[in-house]
């Protein structure tokens, strides 16, 4: 609440300038009719108010997938924290990354990690607000970051997550979407993008017996790198059940429309499994789908950290 009041106070003197800036951004956004429709579709799907700020925040999330985490975990963010506070904030950031790594196994864990991320982001923004050289542009960026975090929390309630993951080249965001089906079946979509490895997307279908999946990249070398881990992927994805995995290089890979769509643009409506299934069946389904997600994310993180380190040494 204090941060909201500080942001509101800082915005008072340049409200008209903010409006002009927002209008300019929306004018630019409207030039891409397809992207504009996607953004409004996502906002409507998750019952998020289509305010100007939310539209701009969603547009930024779609176009700059790692932007939120770069602002939170980047070392260049301005601030007025004292040295001891900087150390405390750095430890909190490390803890959030560790907690997210452990949290992927369950929706409850991811919800708790999301709350911790919001607390760290609030401390980052407080430091910017207190900075002697804070500008109106900084204020706008903070408003956008605050809106993005709020949107992320609302989407997480529908099992659509943005997960920060540490690699040797920095923190990147992994998008995870879980779509439940009947019984123990369902879909798991995972997408990400890094500077060194380009776009990576995976979709897994949990069937009655085993898992089928497609793992793709827009770069041939990354596709071959992922293919080299086929034995590891197959072994861990579904607790010993058969895994039928395929790999592809797709030059024009569109992460926003891969499988169900990174933000659920193309996803079918979630089935009302919580009411129709027994608690036992629901928990078994949850354990299975989130195990698939956790296993793939861990494998990819280990793979990218290793190759990033090799690239840095080269």
Where are these regions (language model features)?
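Intrinsically disordered, low-complexity terminal tails
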Residues: 1-314
